C-alpha cells in the first residue's frame, strides 16, 4: 500500500495565500479512518477503548473528532483535564496517568470521575488522603524480566528488558 500525502503541493500553495505561515493542516478523514481502524482491530476485546494522549496534540478540534469516533483521552496534568472537560469528556472517557501528581490535579481527576492510573501502589494512600478512592483505580505494572530481542515483520525492534523501562 503506497502512502500518499493527503495534501498536494498545489493545495498547500493555495492555502499559503490565505493563511499566515507556519500553520498545521490535519487530515480529518485520515484521523477518523485511523481511529476506526484501531477500534476495529481490537473489536474482539470486549470493552476495548482507545485513549488518545492529550499531550500529543492538545487541539480541541482533534479531540472532538476522536470523541465522535469513540475514543477517550489520556491526561497527565490539570490543564489536559480541563481541556478534555471543555471538549465534553467526563468519567470513563478520561484516563488520568500522571507522575509526581500535584494535589489539585488528582482532585480534578477524581471530580471528573476519571479512571486514575497510579505509578505504584504507594500512591493509593495519597489519592485517598487528597481526593478519595474512586470506584475504579489502575496501577502501572512493570513485569521485569529479560526477553530475547526480536524484530517484527515491519522491522520494529522489540524491547528486550522491560525491567529497564519506567513502566515495562
What role is predicted for each listed range?
Residues 57, 142-144:
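Generic structural motif
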Residues 97, 140, 168:
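Residues in well-ordered beta-strands of folded domains
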Residues 130, 144-168:
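Active-site loop/helix belt of alpha/beta enzymes
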Residues 136-142:
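ATP-grasp fold ATP-binding core
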Residues 1-115, 121-135, 150, 165:
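A charged N-terminal "starter" segment
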Residues 120-121, 141:
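Short secondary-structure boundary segments
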Amino acid at each position: 500500500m503506497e502512502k500518499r500525502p493527503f495534501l498536494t503541493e498545489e493545495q498547500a500553495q493555495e492555502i499559503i495565500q490565505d493563511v499566515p505561515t507556519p500553520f498545521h493542516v490535519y487530515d480529518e478523514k485520515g484521523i477518523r479512518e485511523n481511529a476506526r481502524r484501531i477500534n476495529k482491530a481490537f473489536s474482539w476485546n470486549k470493552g476495548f477503548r482507545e485513549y488518545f494522549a492529550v499531550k500529543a496534540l492538545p487541539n480541541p478540534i482533534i479531540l472532538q473528532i476522536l470523541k465522535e469516533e469513540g475514543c477517550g483521552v489520556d491526561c497527565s496534568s490539570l490543564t489536559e483535564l480541563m481541556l478534555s472537560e471543555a471538549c465534553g469528556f467526563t468519567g470513563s472517557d478520561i484516563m488520568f496517568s500522571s507522575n509526581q501528581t500535584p494535589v489539585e490535579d488528582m482532585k480534578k481527576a477524581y471530580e471528573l470521575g476519571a479512571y486514575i492510573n497510579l505509578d505504584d501502589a504507594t500512591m493509593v494512600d495519597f489519592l485517598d488522603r487528597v481526593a478519595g478512592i474512586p470506584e475504579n483505580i489502575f496501577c502501572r505494572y512493570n513485569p521485569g524480566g529479560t526477553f530475547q530481542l526480536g524484530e517484527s515483520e515491519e522491522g520494529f525492534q522489540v524491547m528486550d528488558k522491560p525491567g529497564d523501562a519506567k513502566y515495562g
